Amino acid sequence: MAPGMSGRRGAALLCLSVLLAHAASRSHPASPSPPGTQASPILPVSYRLSHTRLAFFLKEARPLTPAAINGSLQRSEPFVVFQTKELPVLNVSLGPFSTSQVVARELLQPSSTLDIPERLTVNWKVRAFIVRARVPASQPVAQVLFYVAGRDWDDFGVTERLPCVRLHAFRDAREVRSSCRLGGALATCLVRAELPLAWFGPPAPAAPPSARRKSPDGLEPEAAAESQQVELYYTLHAPDASGGCGSARRGPGPGPGAAARAESPTQHPLLRIGSISLFRPPPRRAVQEHRLDSNLMIRLPDRPLRPGEVLSILLYLAPNSSSAASPSVEHFTLRVKAKKGVTLLGTKSRSGQWRVTSELLTGAKHSTATVDVAWALDTPLPPWEGQGPLEILQLDFEMENFTSQSVKRRIMWHIDYRGHSALPDLERAVTELTVIQRDVQAILPLAMDTEIINTAILTGRTVAIPVKVIAIEVTGLVLDVSDLVECQSHSEDIIKVSSSCDYVFVSGKESRGSMNARVTFRYDVLSAPLEMTVWVPKLPLHIELSDARLSQVKGWRVPILPDRRSARESEDEEEEEEERRQSANRGCTLQYQHATLQVFTQFHTTSSEGTDQVVTMLGPDWLVEVTDLVSDFMRVGDPRVAHLVDSNTLAGLEPGTTPFKVVSPLTEAVLGETLLTVTEEKVSITQLQAQVVASLTLSLRPSPGSSHTILATTAAQPTLSLVKQEALLSLWLSYSDGTTAPLSLYSSRDYGLLVSSLDERVATVTQDKAFPLVVAEAEGSGDLLRAELTISESCQKTKRKSVLATTPVSLRVHFGRDEEDPTYDYPGPSQPGPGGGEDEARGAGPPGTAIPAGEVPGLGTAGPVPPTEDYLPLPTGFLQMPRGLTDLEIGMYALLGVFCLAILVFLINCIVFVLRYRHKRIPPEGQTSMDHSHHWVFLGNGQPLRVQGELSPPAGSALETVPACCHGDHHSSGSSQTSVQSQVHGRGDGSSGGSARDQTEDPASSPTSKRKRVKFTTFTTLPTEELAYDSVPAGEEEDEEEDLGWGCPDVAGTTRPTPPPDLHNYMRRIKDIA
């Protein structure tokens, strides 16, 4: 073999051996040590709720079967939504994969009594307030105010779509109905149901005396008035076509149970409001009396007055006024002074027995009147004993207008008897009048929601609920008097109220809750309480760590950073590179285990003030997660032992024990605490578990056993079903201490992750620092992937990577029957494909669209080049775009290219040799000259074939004009031919051989030619240096007529000597080799 050729073949073999050795080292990973009993990995997805105002994720306090719910391919999470204006959206994500689902109305309000088409009414409640609990027969009207609690008062778009409310009043077997429609800014309406007077009749004989109550005037009415009870219920129904609610119904009807059955199937059942009492007050005049002195008295209406109203006050002579001890009343002067706001219009006599003269004087601040009263008869005034009051005169006063809601007006009275001294000023009488703008019979405070969850204890942010106070007039008019009321909280340790009385709130300084936290509102002489339910978090908080004992991990070295948190959260590439250089200077240390943390609590309250009975929101079986609420107030007692990576992750720093606590945002008091231990013991990674996740599916359903909570279940699909579909790996680490942790718990800067495909015809891998993606190429299944976890590049001590763990990954790629993407039939990673090792790709495209081998559309037709990589045609007919290559792939492809180039050079040399062999022939017999002929020289001691005379040319021959081949003109043959001659002679007889130049130095007649006889023959040349050993003579040895000619072809025409047998055998061997 030629030296040049042997060197190139050796380089090619060296490249091939390197590739095979590298592939062998990558196909046999070290088996991890058999793990012990490890906790099962759980799909590490993250849930997030949006478009909500108040919602919590939950956890069962005593889970029954957690293993059946959560696993490596499934995870369930319960949650509850308290306040929202629109349908919430639940998002679940895993790395770059995410999916969302809108929470359906049926899950949010499974049993809502207030159903509005195409409107969300979560936490909406219809509240009812009885205006008057005791209804007199003089005003036989039952009044109930309805309003919608839990609705945002700024939501005006729904006020025109609210339903009607029907009030049902039952008295024994009789029923009265009346309806109103909810509306207005507060979504309120007042139902007034007129009750039959027969319902105020005598009571049943069985009425107990204990049922009697005292009337407001202090009198005790008969038991008959107190025993009449009327039960009140309500239902909701849609308005009619005109938007009305129908007319009221009065008369006999079925009882409550029968009435519920009488409603249409779409109506809600009867909901109880309460009961009212009916009574008949004793007949009495609604007047009040005031004694001016022992002789005179006045009477005026017993009711509030209205602006502009004329008030008539009558002056009477009281009974028993003409006694001996009393001064004479036959003639007296009455002086009246009305304060500002009251005008005295005039006076007139009510009886002809009295003569009345008056003088009126109106001033800027008050008006006065002097009235002279005298007995008009000639007879003296008889004693007035045992008789009723005697009317004397009438005084008319007018109430002036004012801006406030109510005012107090005063009228002063002074009497001067003729002939007697006046009464002292202390005995002067004063009458006080109440003048109001409206005749309000009741006030009702309304809160936007009836419950308040005190999260301010955890966050320090105030939670407030707006409040409105409305007044109800006797006529049924509803007014907003929120700006005119006063308020006070009964216990600020539970709930507080603003100074302007427009909202109630909790600030975080409260210590307990209550089912009936009370705030009292006052309007003029009226007052009414507002009762709220206040929920407070149960303390101490429950802090849950996935691992309370953290250890160092053997072999896992990470860079030493000044602030691990800032390094993890940094996203700037320049900052990341700078930190990497700094960490290289600081060195590396062993990685500590990480632990996830969650904070839970229960919101509870007391059943009523003064009792210790505890009521838990959602029941005692649920814990509410408040990790996000307290994330800003988490503290590690000793920052040298551990630190917070983020709001959900703890990491160890050095051995020790430290408390982890949640502090109050207002008082720095500890709300919850747990101990964290960082041990000196080291643990090792026993197993790297990997699961392919091709897609995520999210499903929502009601939580079993609770109508308020919703269970979200996320399932991971491990099978890739589409061409070019991407999947990621869910990776978990198992430690020797029996704990497991997701790899995503650690920063991607602290490790290296290499995912490789063992058969790239089935799947390829797109390397990513945190989430390598698997791309489906063709159908297949098995352990087709391998995941390798290494330490950070900056902590590698040698060029050989430190592998922490490696694991095979099972992958299944199966395209559905309806899938039109091409599939790939392959015999396996270690077997050649059909057709002499070339793989076969079958496309699913239409006939005539397949791309033949060696042809690429738009690039012309190439020759039959052996394939180096198989590409699957895309169903759209477009060319597949190349993916980015990693450093490992670039190196492997470079070695493969060198190997292929060496093979190509070898093939070219072979082709050139064959072509030249087939086209070269010896010259025909008698040819005088041959261009490009090779001269074979045989040097030996055998006898010459011819005598000296025969070898010498005759005189005058053409030797002088025709170049003699014996001289071997090297100028005509070329250097390459000379080189071939030298190599062939060296191999033919073992001698060093001679060149043509050496032969010309010794003429044919030289005496030295007798010592060594030279034999010449001529063959067809092969002008290839490297393949000289494959030379084949142009002549056929078997042909007797074309034997080898020795000497020059121009002089050998006369004699055809027979070649020696050894040369004949040698040339046959050369031909056989070719």
From Swiss-Prot:
Q: Which residues lie on this side of the membrane: Extracellular?
A: 26-894
GO biological process terms, alphabetically, are: posterior lateral line neuromast hair cell development
Give residue spans, biased composition: Low complexity. Answer: 247-262, 843-854, 973-985, 1016-1026
Q: Tell me how this protein sits in the membrane.
A: Single-pass type I membrane protein
- What InterPro entries does the database record attribute to this sequence? Ig_TMEM132_2nd, Ig_TMEM132_5th, Ig_TMEM132_6th, TMEM132, TMEM132_3rd, TMEM132_C, TMEM132_M, TMEM132_N
Show the GO cellular component annotation of the record: cell body; membrane
Tell me which UniProt keywords the record has, alphabetically. Glycoprotein, Membrane, Signal, Transmembrane, Transmembrane helix
Region Disordered, as annotated, extends over 205-224, 243-266, 564-587, 816-867, 962-1064
Segments spanning the bilayer are 895-915
Q: What does the protein in this record do?
A: Required for normal inner ear hair cell function and hearing.
State what protein this is by name: Transmembrane protein 132E
Organism field: Mus musculus (Mouse)
Task: Report the gene name.
Answer: Tmem132e
